[in-house]
Amino acid sequence: MELVSFGVEKLWDRLSQEYDQFKGVEDQVTELKSNLNLLKSFLKDADAKKHISEMVRHCVEEIKDIVYDTEDIIETFILKEKVEMKRGIMKRIKRFASTIMDRRELASDIGGISKRISKVIQDMQSFGVQQIITDGSRSSHPLQERQREMRHTFSRDSENDFVGMEANVKKLVGYLVEKDDYQIVSLTGMGGLGKTTLARQVFNHDVVKDRFDGFAWVSVSQEFTRISVWQTILQNLTSKERKDEIQNMKEADLHDDLFRLLESSKTLIVLDDIWKEEDWDLIKPIFPPKKGWKVLLTSRTESIAMRGDTTYISFKPKCLSIPDSWTLFQSIAMPRKDTSEFKVDEEMENMGKKMIKHCGGLSLAVKVLGGLLAAKYTLHDWKRLSENIGSHIVERTSGNNSSIDHVLSVSFEELPNYLKHCFLYLAHFPEDHEIDVEKLHYYWAAEGISERRRYDGETIRDTGDSYIEELVRRNMVISERDVMTSRFETCRLHDMMREICLFKAKEENFLQIVSNHSPTSNPQTLGASRRFVLHNPTTLHVERYKNNPKLRSLVVVYDDIGNRRWMLSGSIFTRVKLLRVLDLVQAKFKGGKLPSDIGKLIHLRYLSLKDAKVSHLPSSLRNLVLLIYLDIRTDFTDIFVPNVFMGMRELRYLELPRFMHEKTKLELSNLEKLEALENFSTKSSSLEDLRGMVRLRTLVIILSEGTSLQTLSASVCGLRHLENFKIMENAGVNRMGEERMVLDFTYLKKLTLSIEMPRLPKIQHLPSHLTVLDLSYCCLEEDPMPILEKLLELKDLSLDYLSFSGRKMVCSAGGFPQLRKLALDEQEEWEEWIVEEGSMSRLHTLSIWSSTLKELPDGLRFIYSLKNLIMGKSWMERLSERGEEFYKVQNIPFIKFSS
């Protein structure tokens, strides 16, 4: 099922599900469903064949318009019906005549749609379009193909990325560590060669880690600003506490800070993906002459060179050889060679070797091709794909990279249809943008992309993660699951894959991108697009292009550090009434008031006002009953939130402001489908409202004066599916006496406690599968380690500011068997830490920010897994080679001192 037939299928499902709503127009709806079924039979492989014939393309575009228009007609009618059902009997009687008119109008609209479908089918028959489409239809049964895909396990061994690179890594490490004459190493070559992968291997190499004191990695991109690059470097090289300060620094101050820092430290800075020599000229003033710093930069352009500079060397890695390409291809495409399900014969091997020649030795293209064939189990499938790649290359041979581009392009054509929509959505984001995966999942859900494949009990995030995993396995998206939470947190696109994504999105008229760097767009083109994304917007951008009544999605994306605002006129809400997705990050409105006309956007599924300059929310928000995602975390600290949520029964994600007006009172008991609720305040809402939210996976609670921990425990004990739980309390809350909490949630993986509590709960009252724990402001009177070290799956522990008020902590032998990361922040009374031999046997990273701790524990010598130690600068002398405590840390490869 291809892109356009996917839309038809969704529409057919909707008509079937809501059939009871269409009393009085059943005949018209039945006829429409029949026409849609007929249309589906003509659409097999239409998208795959539309490049062959302009007539096919025209028909596909017309069908898209029909599907969108029909969805709008049907949904508008259903929403009106639901509103009427909520009215009193007298009001419904008064509107009886109007209801009859609504049904007549619906019958007329459906009749018009049916005529348009008949016209398209007639055109397809008259001009032979049907034959063009069906000539290339696939022989594989869709269900069987999907079952094979579901059974298949893809290889994602990190060593796959390393095939053929061993010599390159060794040489680059030598340049950085052994060759002091070279301060700048340039890694150049075409896109997809594996430059970033190679740079990452070098950046994380143990020998390199041992050589330098500080490290910074910056993705430069085509549309960078000098200040953003300098800010990122300084943030990498200094403490996390300076992040906000650095964001607000002037360019001259950034320059001076970096210049001084690089004069006095051994630092490695990677500048990934510099496009022009002029870009390097902008960045380089921060580097003092001939000091301990080194730069590794990657670029597609070999002219990124230091003219006459003897401290510079260029390195161009070779493309993969045919044998190395074949080795890499086999590891991905044939991980289970010659199983009962998958037999690789000589003919298939020959086809595979022939196809990898089209990859030109580029590791990205080889991996994508391997991902394509990994899900193909028959000789027929391999032949079809081989011919498809060949035909694409014959059709377009201009340009050096045409073969590679089309290997990547075919990877898109071979995606299951639901993944095509998911992949195209990634075109929303700027180059090198770290995409928030959770938000992406809700974009998909709001547009109905993930509706048809969600299984019982599965959350929107579960479904979305499965999509990301499939795209990662096909080497089309770069991401990995967080080892602590098992979730995908961010993802991004390789440059070449992003070019394919943008090309396909433009070809499909999937969305329109407007930014300060893009050419001026034609308003007529924008008027035909149903998705509109603004990169770093200005008021002019929106005002110029807001008159598009068919707009489905309006998304704002910021790709750099800044605190800019852009003005949005309230009149836009009266002109784009079909919006499903509205993301207004950092917007501002006249007088700080969100216009009440937003309540007219009754089709909205996704609304974000994150960091918007809004002090007042209108009560008309209650009309947005289809919302599944709502973020009203605005940039005001005393915002009044109206009580508008009881009708929003479809909400899955709700983020409230951290600080609300004291008169705010919210009823949330109807939100039984919520999967994430953030900033729930016991001052503004009742804990009783939580009892019915049994689907919650994420919950952030703010406790007010008078709320006991026992009451809280009783209210949330039924939320058995919680994975991420955070408890905070308002400043000034005074807890008298000892209070006990029970937090025994079976699936809880991440727990954050920022509340005063003299003692931890007993071990049997803590989640047994907890992997991440963050404590702050707890003022624990007893050493927490004897309890926490018994959490057998704990991997990440942070004892942040004032979490412990005692003097001594002890980590005993055998404790913390899975702990990988430990952070110990400032504790005002903490003086002594004992680590027994055999404790924390898997610890990898240790951070200590304490001015009161008298000495490091001797037991650190026996933690052989410890690779990274981060300390305050006050420890530098004691831990230097001649320092009194050096023997405790001498086996740790990387030690960093930060202010």
From Swiss-Prot:
Role summary: Potential disease resistance protein.
Record's protein name: Probable disease resistance protein RXW24L
Record comment regarding domains: The LRR repeats probably act as specificity determinant of pathogen recognition.
Single Gene Ontology MF annotation: ATP binding
Gene Ontology biological-process annotations: defense response; response to other organism
Similarity comment: family membership: Belongs to the disease resistance NB-LRR family.
Binding residues annotated for ATP, in chain numbering: 189-196
Residue span(s) of domain NB-ARC: 143-455
Keyword vocabulary terms for this entry: ATP-binding, Coiled coil, Nucleotide-binding, Plant defense, Repeat
Signal peptide: none
The gene coding this protein: RXW24L
Database matches in SUPFAM superfamilies: L domain-like, P-loop containing nucleoside triphosphate hydrolases
InterPro entries attached to this UniProt entry: Apaf_helical, Disease_R_plants, LRR_dom_sf, LRR_R13L4/SHOC2-like, NB-ARC, P-loop_NTPase, RX-like_CC, Rx_N
Chain coiled-coil ranges: 13-50
Protein source organism: Arabidopsis thaliana
Keyword ATP-binding: yes
